[in-house]
């Protein structure tokens, strides 16, 4: 774990090797989040607010409750509140380009976190690496199943950056294992535990031989694990998740499901604030700042429970 923290610290530090802006040049930051029901977004929000507060910066946070039109209206309002920088996590793919455009018209730098729009990207994009990490999660559950079986994949919100990358990574793992067949995909709207339960319940009934489930977020995986427990299946079903939510880490320790990829959500929040400060001062930051997630099982989960990155 100490080695991993050093790697994370290095990844963050290398983004800021040239120059630096004073926090005194930024007094107010706007933060737009898709929802505050997902632990992943809660951790980013808390990290941004705590770190900004230490630098004397006020953060105005708006929660779209997963509604793109609501988020656009909220961002329009943020642009009237004299913010110095805008931290943006799109609520969906459909309207993801509008808020950055509004901010640029107002001369406000944009830091996209977790999700980016190809046609209207942020001035910098901060995210956890998704393809390689999803590949590792799916490879792990496939290995647990002996390289054979039927899989269902429960996706996040269709078309957003994490969903696209995690799908790609898991599909790569499936392609490398001819004994595994992906029998069903289904997309969620909110990446939630309730959706994970209902989707998995329906798919397990339709495909009773399934022995592999990949939920593209820990909420989906935990819901799927509950559906597995309720299914009465006479064979072992291995479940993988993604994100390293605090509740999910404890569930892995308890054996509720098998594996996740823990993201450095708190490091991402701090990096977003530092990037905003630098951009507002006219400094340069990389177009993309990507931090690796870490494969997490019962063997190493304790370290992440005690000190989430």
Which residues fall in each region the model found?
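A residue-level marker of the well-folded mature domains of exported/periplasmic proteins
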Residues: 2-7, 11, 15-18, 23-309
């Amino acid at each position: 774990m100490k080695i991993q923290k050093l790697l994370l610290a290095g990844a963050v530090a290398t983004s800021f090797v040239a120059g630096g802006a004073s926090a005194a040049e930024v007094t107010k930051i706007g933060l737009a989040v898709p929802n505050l029901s997902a632990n992943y977004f809660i951790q980013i929000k808390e990290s941004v607010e705590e770190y900004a507060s230490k630098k004397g910066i006020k953060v105005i946070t708006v929660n779209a409750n997963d509604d793109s039109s609501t988020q656009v209206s909220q961002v329009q309002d943020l642009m009237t509140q004299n913010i110095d920088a805008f931290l943006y996590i799109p609520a969906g793919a459909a309207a993801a380009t509008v808020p950055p455009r509004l901010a640029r018209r107002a001369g406000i730098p944009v830091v996209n976190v977790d999700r980016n729009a190809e046609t209207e990207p942020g001035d910098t994009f901060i995210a956890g690496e998704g393809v390689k990490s999803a590949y590792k999660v799916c490879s792990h559950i496939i290995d647990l199943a002996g390289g054979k079986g039927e899989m269902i994949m429960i996706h996040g919100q269709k078309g957003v950056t994490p969903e696209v990358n995690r799908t790609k990574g898991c599909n790569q793992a499936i392609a490398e294992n001819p004994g595994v067949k992906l029998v069903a995909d289904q997309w969620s709207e909110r990446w939630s535990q309730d959706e994970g339960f209902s989707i998995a319940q329906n798919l397990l009934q339709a495909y009773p031989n399934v022995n592999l489930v990949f939920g593209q977020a820990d909420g989906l995986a935990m819901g799927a694990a509950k559906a597995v427990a309720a299914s009465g299946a006479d064979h072992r079903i291995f479940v993988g998740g993604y994100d390293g939510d605090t509740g999910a880490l404890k569930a892995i320790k308890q054996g509720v499901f098998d594996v996740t990829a823990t993201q450095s959500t708190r490091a991402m929040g701090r990096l977003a604030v530092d990037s905003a400060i630098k951009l507002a001062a006219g400094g340069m930051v990389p177009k993309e700042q990507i931090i690796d997630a870490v494969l997490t099982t019962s063997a190493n989960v304790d370290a992440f429970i005690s000190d989430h990155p």
